[in-house]
């Protein structure tokens, strides 16, 4: 939590606004967490006090598992304004599946999570950040409107026909690096992180 608190302080000092979803090219920050770790529930009051309502990408198979959010906690947080979206069924690298396995991970998880939460799941974050053209097509066919990657860059850098969205992973960066990233200077790393996460 210390890192998160420092980052929030920096963002506020630099006059950034935390929003549930980006709708402007500058001045906004959207907070996301992958996997649905139990610690997010323990930190929920901090986020509420700071008017920050993160999007949390959860894998169906991890819900109610030790160390992860329970369905009851997820529903409580959703009622408070936290957003939950898809992160596959099993949280494995989606590029490793055959067509049937990929469909289960992407479509069945979307349907199951939508039913659990009483709302349509419209976004997915690729587990381990890994994706391919086949994964993108499957996600689009399943009805996902936004596909969140782990490729560095601004929110709009990859938005296009593939509906891919850049995200900057900041849990391990210094305060100076964090400011550099939020000042929209992370696009420099798009090609490098693309090589790490994208498979044709």
Where are these regions (language model features)?
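Thr-Gly-centered strand-to-loop micro-motif
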Residues: 88, 126-127
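Residue-level signal for pocket-adjacent positions within structured domains
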Residues: 58, 89, 160
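Acidic (Asp/Glu)-rich catalytic clusters
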Residues: 8-14, 43-52, 69-86, 140, ...
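Short beta-strand and adjacent tight-turn residues that come in two discontinuous sequence segments
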Residues: 57, 87, 147-149
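C-terminal active-site subregion of NodB/CE4 polysaccharide deacetylases
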Residues: 1-33, 37-40, 96-123, 129-200
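Histidine/lysine/aspartate-rich catalytic loop segments that bind and position anionic ligands
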Residues: 62, 69-104
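Short histidine/acidic/glycine/proline-rich micro-motifs that form metal-
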Residues: 60-65, 93, 128-130, 153
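A structural signal for isolated positions on well-ordered beta-strands in alpha/beta enzyme cores
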Residues: 30, 55, 83-85, 123
